[in-house]
């Protein structure tokens, strides 16, 4: 079964600047930061009819993370290691949300994992 991309993050040192940039360049509707400092990007901006959700947040280094829906994040991390990748973030239960993890491919590109 093909695993769909279900979420993305765009992070950097100045999330206010990032919010404004993406609002302007793509016309995205982006919420103001929630108590966790995360601004959610509204659905329906393209792609599948339901859209792909996203967030703007503070990160030490700028990066975009695409999240792929998987059945078991821990099992997927183990598979990534077996294929030459590495763990970036162990599985973590987001308060009131899903279990997420991050891996890097053999070239170092970070991919997020979210439990289906």
Listing of model-derived features with the role each one plays in the protein:
Residues 16-17, 74-75, 98:
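Short alpha-helical
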Residues 28-62, 110-115:
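Conserved short beta-strand elements that form part of the metal-binding/catalytic scaffold
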Residues 7-43:
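N-terminal first-folded block
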Residues 10, 77-78, 83-116:
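Vicinal oxygen chelate
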Residues 59-87:
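Mid-chain, well-packed structural core segment of small domains
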Residues 1-19, 64-66, 115-116:
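N-terminal beta-strand motif that seeds the catalytic metal site of vicinal oxygen chelate
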Residues 5, 51, 98:
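Short coil/loop residues immediately preceding or within conserved phosphate-binding loops
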């Amino acid at each position: 079964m093909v695993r769909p991309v279900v979420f993305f993050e765009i992070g950097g040192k100045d999330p206010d600047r990032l919010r404004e940039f993406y609002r302007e360049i793509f016309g995205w509707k982006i919420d103001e930061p929630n108590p966790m400092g995360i601004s959610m990007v509204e659905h329906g901006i393209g792609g599948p009819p339901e859209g792909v959700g996203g967030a703007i947040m503070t990160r030490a280094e700028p990066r975009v993370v695409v999240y792929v829906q998987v059945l078991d994040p821990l099992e997927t991390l183990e598979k990534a290691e077996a294929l030459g990748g590495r763990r970036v973030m162990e599985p973590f239960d987001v308060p009131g949300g899903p279990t997420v993890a991050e891996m890097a491919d053999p070239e170092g590109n970070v991919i997020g994992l979210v439990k289906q």
